[in-house]
Amino acid sequence: MLEKTMRMNYLYDFYQALLTPKQRSYMSLYYLDDYSLGEIAQQYEVSRQAVYDNIKRTEAMLEEYEKKLSLFQKFQKRKQLMNQLKDYVLQKYGEDKQLFDMIKELEELE
Protein backbone atom coordinates (compact mmCIF):
# COMPACT_ATOMS: atom_id res chain seq x y z
CA MET A 1 0.00 0.00 0.00
CA LEU A 2 2.80 2.41 0.87
CA GLU A 3 4.48 1.72 -2.47
CA LYS A 4 1.24 2.49 -4.33
CA THR A 5 0.78 5.69 -2.33
CA MET A 6 4.31 6.84 -3.13
CA ARG A 7 3.83 6.03 -6.82
CA MET A 8 0.53 7.93 -6.94
CA ASN A 9 2.13 10.90 -5.20
CA TYR A 10 4.87 11.01 -7.83
CA LEU A 11 2.43 10.55 -10.72
CA TYR A 12 0.25 13.28 -9.24
CA ASP A 13 3.27 15.60 -9.01
CA PHE A 14 4.20 14.98 -12.63
CA TYR A 15 0.74 15.06 -14.20
CA GLN A 16 -1.51 17.14 -11.96
CA ALA A 17 -1.71 19.93 -14.54
CA LEU A 18 -3.54 17.49 -16.83
CA LEU A 19 -6.29 16.83 -14.27
CA THR A 20 -9.51 18.74 -13.65
CA PRO A 21 -9.71 20.88 -10.51
CA LYS A 22 -12.02 18.34 -8.85
CA GLN A 23 -9.68 15.45 -9.69
CA ARG A 24 -6.74 17.42 -8.31
CA SER A 25 -8.64 18.20 -5.14
CA TYR A 26 -9.78 14.61 -4.50
CA MET A 27 -6.31 13.21 -5.19
CA SER A 28 -4.61 15.83 -3.06
CA LEU A 29 -6.94 15.24 -0.13
CA TYR A 30 -6.74 11.46 -0.41
CA TYR A 31 -3.04 10.94 -1.11
CA LEU A 32 -1.28 14.04 0.21
CA ASP A 33 -3.50 15.01 3.15
CA ASP A 34 -4.50 11.42 4.05
CA TYR A 35 -8.24 12.10 4.14
CA SER A 36 -10.55 9.09 4.13
CA LEU A 37 -13.11 8.58 1.37
CA GLY A 38 -15.82 9.44 3.89
CA GLU A 39 -14.16 12.71 4.88
CA ILE A 40 -13.82 13.78 1.25
CA ALA A 41 -17.43 12.76 0.55
CA GLN A 42 -18.63 14.81 3.51
CA GLN A 43 -16.61 17.85 2.45
CA TYR A 44 -17.99 17.75 -1.12
CA GLU A 45 -21.47 16.56 -0.11
CA VAL A 46 -21.34 13.52 -2.38
CA SER A 47 -21.45 9.79 -1.71
CA ARG A 48 -18.41 7.85 -0.61
CA GLN A 49 -18.86 5.73 -3.74
CA ALA A 50 -18.69 8.84 -5.95
CA VAL A 51 -15.37 9.81 -4.36
CA TYR A 52 -14.04 6.26 -4.71
CA ASP A 53 -15.04 6.10 -8.39
CA ASN A 54 -13.46 9.48 -9.11
CA ILE A 55 -10.19 8.54 -7.41
CA LYS A 56 -10.02 5.17 -9.20
CA ARG A 57 -10.67 6.83 -12.59
CA THR A 58 -8.05 9.47 -11.85
CA GLU A 59 -5.50 6.82 -10.81
CA ALA A 60 -6.12 5.03 -14.11
CA MET A 61 -5.68 8.30 -16.00
CA LEU A 62 -2.39 9.02 -14.21
CA GLU A 63 -1.13 5.53 -15.05
CA GLU A 64 -2.14 6.05 -18.69
CA TYR A 65 -0.29 9.39 -18.81
CA GLU A 66 2.78 7.67 -17.37
CA LYS A 67 2.50 4.85 -19.90
CA LYS A 68 2.54 7.40 -22.73
CA LEU A 69 4.95 10.03 -21.38
CA SER A 70 7.16 8.08 -18.93
CA LEU A 71 8.07 11.15 -16.86
CA PHE A 72 8.25 9.19 -13.60
CA GLN A 73 10.24 6.36 -15.17
CA LYS A 74 12.73 8.85 -16.64
CA PHE A 75 12.96 10.62 -13.29
CA GLN A 76 13.80 7.34 -11.54
CA LYS A 77 16.42 6.50 -14.17
CA ARG A 78 18.04 9.95 -13.84
CA LYS A 79 18.10 9.56 -10.07
CA GLN A 80 19.71 6.12 -10.36
CA LEU A 81 22.34 7.39 -12.81
CA MET A 82 23.05 10.39 -10.61
CA ASN A 83 23.73 8.07 -7.65
CA GLN A 84 26.02 5.93 -9.79
CA LEU A 85 27.84 9.04 -10.99
CA LYS A 86 28.33 10.28 -7.43
CA ASP A 87 29.70 6.90 -6.34
CA TYR A 88 32.08 6.78 -9.30
CA VAL A 89 33.30 10.34 -8.77
CA LEU A 90 33.82 9.66 -5.08
CA GLN A 91 35.96 6.61 -5.89
CA LYS A 92 37.97 8.12 -8.75
CA TYR A 93 38.00 11.86 -8.04
CA GLY A 94 37.36 12.08 -4.30
CA GLU A 95 39.41 15.26 -3.93
CA ASP A 96 37.75 17.26 -6.73
CA LYS A 97 35.44 19.70 -4.93
CA GLN A 98 34.44 21.48 -8.13
CA LEU A 99 33.20 18.22 -9.63
CA PHE A 100 31.14 17.49 -6.51
CA ASP A 101 29.67 21.01 -6.60
CA MET A 102 28.62 20.49 -10.22
CA ILE A 103 26.94 17.19 -9.36
CA LYS A 104 25.14 18.86 -6.46
CA GLU A 105 23.85 21.56 -8.83
CA LEU A 106 22.56 18.89 -11.19
CA GLU A 107 20.75 17.17 -8.33
CA GLU A 108 19.11 20.41 -7.27
CA LEU A 109 17.64 20.83 -10.77
CA GLU A 110 15.44 17.80 -10.16
From Swiss-Prot:
Quote the InterPro entries the UniProt record gives. RNA_pol_sigma_r3/r4-like, UPF0122, UPF0122_fam_protein, WH-like_DNA-bd_sf
A single Pfam family, by name?
A: UPF0122
Organism of provenance: Geobacillus sp. (strain WCH70)
From the Swiss-Prot or TrEMBL record, give the protein name.
Answer: UPF0122 protein GWCH70_1086
Q: Which family does it belong to?
A: Belongs to the UPF0122 family.
Domain of life, per the record? Bacteria
**Function (record text):** Might take part in the signal recognition particle (SRP) pathway. This is inferred from the conservation of its genetic proximity to ftsY/ffh. May be a regulatory protein.
